Amino acid sequence: MAILSDRDIKRYIEEGLITIDPLDDPERQIQPSSVDLRIGNEFKGFRVIRKPCIDPKDPSDIESYMETFHVEDGPFIIHPGEFALATTHEYIALPEDLVARVEGRSSIGRLGITMHVTAGYIDPGFHGRITLEISNIGKMPVALYPRQRVCQIVFETMTSPAERPYGHPSRDSKYIGQTRPQTSRIKDDYEIRNSRL
């Protein structure tokens, strides 16, 4: 596997192999080996609820534990210890022979903000807006503005196209085509759904 350089990223975009829409400022967004992505204007945070824990086997919809915030003018403030979901402003589509990773920008990380907790890997065949799992591990609240560059996507070639890429009918591709912050669909995992635990 090899990481795409800026010239290869531009070529893949020009040839329609990678979709990044909108890519409003390619000169600023395309870096030597990545593309800076911006945060959208919709955020989800956990409500304070009276439950001992989130249990994947509980039939309650995890969505009901979340509150949605739309930010048009001004920032979304994330406080120390808080967790929120958002999406990239850009819609991304990958071919069947590329994978991608999302990493936080160092300028954001130096404020104590992480952009993904564990889900930084994007499978071949994915298309949609990427859900960001944002945490403030610092000691001060931080303002995040819609369309602010907060993360970067790195593309890697595969040795061959995936036989069953993300979105294939035989896969449980729970997040294909997402356009809004998507809460966990862990209850749809095979082992949970079929009481294998």
UniProtKB/Swiss-Prot annotation:
Enzyme class: hydrolase
UniProt keywords, alphabetically: Hydrolase, Nucleotide metabolism, Nucleotide-binding
Gene3D superfamilies: 2.70.40.10
Function comment: Bifunctional enzyme that catalyzes both the deamination of dCTP to dUTP and the hydrolysis of dUTP to dUMP without releasing the toxic dUTP intermediate.
Domain of life per record: Archaea
Region span, Disordered: 161-183
GO molecular function: dCTP deaminase (dUMP-forming) activity; dCTP deaminase activity; nucleotide binding
Gene name of this polypeptide: dcd
SUPFAM superfamilies: dUTPase-like
Pfam families linked: DCD (PF22769)
EC number: 3.5.4.30
Catalytic residues identified in the record: 133
Subunit composition and interactions: Homotrimer.
Record GO biological process: dUMP biosynthetic process; dUTP biosynthetic process; nucleobase-containing small molecule interconversion
Organism: Methanothermobacter thermautotrophicus (strain ATCC 29096 / DSM 1053 / JCM 10044 / NBRC 100330 / Delta H)
Protein name, entry field: dCTP deaminase, dUMP-forming
Bias kind Basic and acidic residues: ranges: 165-174
